[in-house]
């Protein structure tokens, strides 16, 4: 992220499909975390979402590089729940399978946590708190997403988001 105060990501590669312009009267009230179940780059996410009816606002790569895919003023299709989509920012994280478990790299975990903190500050959501203003995708849809972010790496992730 190039500027935490203004939420400027390292790169911008905006989707031209599979999101909704505006927020249908909603405003950003919380953050929804996701994992790629793959080691995708910003460009890789962009490519996948050209044919898959899904999107997210932000992608965090394995090396910590951040990318904006949908503007915050618009609705990404990420939570499987329209209210959640129109009232949140969706943040995707690259990860890898290690011993049959999806795991974030150190750089992804650190960058993701700092992006969450920056979003909470910018949108005046309060201190990042799990299940208060930071939610797993699985809270809104039947899914194991965001894997380790809601499991083995949750405490470290949320600690770094402070």
Where are these regions (language model features)?
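Basic/polar, cationic surfaces and motifs that engage anionic cell-wall
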Residues: 1-25, 96-162
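Short strand-loop junctions, especially beta-strand C-caps/beta-turns
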Residues: 36, 94-96
